[in-house]
Design a protein with these regions (language model features):
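Catalytic cores of large soluble enzymes that bind and process phosphate-bearing ligands
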Residues: 1-5, 40-51, 87, 138-139, ...
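Short, surface-exposed acidic
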Residues: 19-29, 160-163, 315-317, 354
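Common nucleic-acid-contacting/processivity interface regions adjacent to the catalytic cores
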Residues: 33-155, 162-165, 171, 178, ...
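Active-site-proximal helix-loop-helix substrate-binding element of RNase H-like nuclease domains
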Residues: 1-53, 176
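Catalytic nucleotidyl-transfer cores of nucleotide-processing enzymes
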Residues: 1-4, 112-275, 372-395
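Short beta-strand
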Residues: 315-320, 359
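C-terminal polymerase-core module
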Residues: 325-467
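Secondary-structure transition/capping motifs at alpha-helix termini
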Residues: 65, 161, 244-247, 276, ...
Length: 467
């Protein structure tokens, strides 16, 4: 909901309601009510009533109850389960309703079966960024819902998987059985009738990691059906929000809760298949197929962009799972928007539906430091004149540092992007350090807030926040 450095009642009230709330300890309130004068008892009661009313206002402002109720309706689970159960329960609830009419039963593997399946072998592509300060435009392109789209496009599902070609060739020894028609698949084994692969050889898709799946012409996967319905429903809901949301705030909140719930379910479906430690129904063959297909999709897009260097002058300087940062040397910001759209449309045409590359934004200028650490002035449309500072992974947006670090870094970025003059950056930072040394800043700016996980730290010396 809100990314805060501290989740005390007073801090939440300040950020959500824009009010300043006094802080009284429970001991003090108890002493007012039990031993205090009439005035102090009234003060204690007023504070308790204020906290109760403020809590209700926070719930209303954040829409927690509305979202949970609408999500329960969409998924088909009870209200309490939305708040207390995890994402696997939600995926399974939807999948069970789709599987039942098809007369499929969802297996329930034991912890031993989950632990005995082979380890995952495939990793998403995360390129080492070409760390630099870029004054020319950097276009950010993102594959929209990459893993759900891959599962739909290639029909990856429990109900369509024939297993790894390597395991099929290895025979019963790999599956731990003496039945020569069975081979290993995820946490269990699969019985393939003799001659089935031969009969289906024209109707099989082999994933990049060597796992065979039947095409939709033979059987449409349950996961693909579920995801396609989720994504299509979300598009319809978002269109309805644009059409009627501005005239009806209550309806807009309800529709937004629906589309957010559908998005969350679609995004965690891969995790349901890949949860190899605590999963309810993991299948490493399917999970690896999804990851490796996504990796090859991104690699293919990068190769295509580099092959068109003469046309666009584009070079991929960073890539992470489903997104690319494309540097356009010598191009204007207006040209960057045009070229970015051309790249997105060309790569979308290369891939089967519904895999789609989406043009996200343009950074100019931009600093790439390392993996998942960058910042830049963001433009989302050619008409935008005032940039927005966008950052990821830096102390500027992290919640485990102090306010003075965030403020100074934000000011540093502003001076650098506005002037491109390192001497002015140095002057600004020197001035801030001088103010710190003179004690001109509030002590609140130096408070470090970091999550404490007692029992997880090694060594004799605990970190400062755990003492």
């Amino acid at each position: 909901e809100f990314s805060l450095t501290s989740y005390t009642f007073e801090n939440i009230v300040r950020h959500v309601l824009g009010e300043t709330s006094p802080h009284y300890s429970l001991d003090r309130i108890a002493s007012w009510l039990e031993n205090g004068s009439a005035v102090m008892r009234i003060r204690g009661l007023r504070y308790i009533v204020y906290r109760a009313k403020a809590s209700i206002r926070i719930l209303d402002r954040t829409g927690v109850i509305t979202r949970a109720a609408e999500l329960a309706k969409v998924i088909g689970i009870d209200f309490n389960a939305v708040l207390t159960r995890g994402s696997q329960f939600r995926v399974e609830s939807l999948m069970a309703r789709i599987a039942h009419p098809e007369q499929f039963i969802l297996p329930s593997p034991s912890r031993e079966q989950v632990a005995q399946q082979r380890a995952a072998e495939c990793l998403p592509l995360v390129l080492e960024p070409q760390s630099s300060y870029y004054t020319d435009p950097v276009v950010v392109l993102d594959f929209q819902s990459l893993y759900p789209s891959v599962m739909i496009a290639y029909n990856y599902c429990y109900s369509t998987c024939l297993g790894s070609l390597e395991d099929i060739a290895a025979g019963p020894e790999a599956a731990g059985t003496h039945d020569h028609s069975r081979h290993r698949l995820g946490v269990s084994s699969l019985d393939l009738p003799p001659g089935l692969l031969n009969a289906l050889k024209e109707h099989i898709t082999v994933s990049p990691n060597g796992v065979a799946f039947v095409k939709p012409s033979v059987r449409r996967g349950l996961l693909g059906r579920m995801l396609q319905e989720l994504l299509e429903s979300r598009i319809v809901i978002r269109d309805a929000m644009k059409r009627w949301g501005s005239d009806n705030a209550v309806l807009c909140k309800k529709l937004d809760a629906w589309q957010l719930g559908l998005k969350l379910i679609a995004n965690v479906t891969y995790g349901y298949a890949g949860a190899s430690f605590s999963g309810r129904m993991p299948c490493v063959d399917i999970a690896d197929a999804i990851v490796q297909s996504g990796r090859e999709t991104l690699e293919s897009a990068i190769r295509f962009i580099h092959s068109k260097h003469a046309q666009w002058g584009a070079r991929v300087v960073y890539g992470d799972t489903d997104s690319m940062f494309v540097h356009l040397s010598g191009q204007s910001r207006e040209s960057a928007f045009r070229i970015g759209q051309e790249i997105a449309e060309a790569i979308t045409r290369m891939n089967p539906a519904p895999i789609k590359l989406k043009f996200e934004k343009v950074y100019q200028p931009c600093v790439l430091l390392s993996k998942k650490r960058y910042a830049g002035w963001m433009f989302t449309s050619p008409e935008q004149t005032e940039p927005l500072l966008d950052a990821k992974g830096l102390e500027l947006v992290r919640r485990d540092g102090c306010l003075v670090t965030q403020r100074v870094l934000e000011g540093t970025m502003d001076v650098l992007f506005r002037t491109n003059d390192l001497s002015l950056v140095k002057s600004y930072v020197t001035g801030e350090i001088t103010r710190i040394m003179r004690g001109e800043l509030s002590l609140q700016e130096f408070i470090i807030a970091k999550e404490v996980r007692l029992g997880t730290y090694s060594g004799r010396v605990l970190p400062a926040h755990a003492k």
